[in-house]
Amino acid sequence: LVGGKFRSEIRAYASQLQSGWAANRGKCREPQEDGEAALKAREEGYDCVKYDFFSYAPDGREYHGEDYNRILSPATLRMLEARTAAVREAMGPDGDIIVESHARPNANAAIQIGQALEKYGIYYYEEPNTPTPKMTKYISEHVNIPLASGERIVTRWQYAPYFENNSLRVIQ
């Protein structure tokens, strides 16, 4: 924006694939559907996708606060892992996956989700919970995935504590 042209291309990612992709728009309820949406995006040339794996339950209902504002059950974690594994398979080892949480989980659930998904080589974990400097630092100390935020942090003064405590790796 200031200082002249720096690059001729920028990278874009396919976003919110939990709602399907292209002609396959609709709620992804099963891991196979998540994988198919990622594969469609990959075929269109995207090498990075962003998902909220905690949007739609297998029965089609939307998840709500009571589903992710608590310690998550082993069955829930297996479901999140199965969905992530399907997307990882579709994207291949070199494709990037961004996990989106819309700041909904509490800290316990955010940590559980992050730890369960670490093995899938997640590019970054966006808004794992409602951001506060201390809570974001706490989550960053328990999850080995770069954390991102920005939809709820908007000024340089609001970002300062996150830079000072080194809890965010990506700002948006």
Predicted feature locations:
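Residue-level detector of flexible, active-site-proximal loop/helix-junction positions
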Residues: K5, S19, V154
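Short beta-strand/loop segments at the ligand-binding rim of alpha/beta enzyme cores
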Residues: K5-A12, A90-E100, S140-G150
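Catalytic cores of alpha/beta
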Residues: A107-Q115, V154-N166
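Phenylalanine-focused residue identity feature
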Residues: F6, F53-F54, Y138, F163
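Glycine-enriched alpha-helix->loop->beta-strand junction motifs that scaffold or abut catalytic
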Residues: G45, Q115-Y123, S140-A148, F163-I171
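Thr-Gly-centered strand-to-loop micro-motif
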Residues: E126-E127, S149-E151
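Metal-dependent enolase-superfamily TIM-barrel catalytic cores that perform enediolate-based chemistry
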Residues: A14-P133, K137
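Metal- or metallocofactor-binding catalytic centers and their adjacent structured scaffolds
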Residues: L1
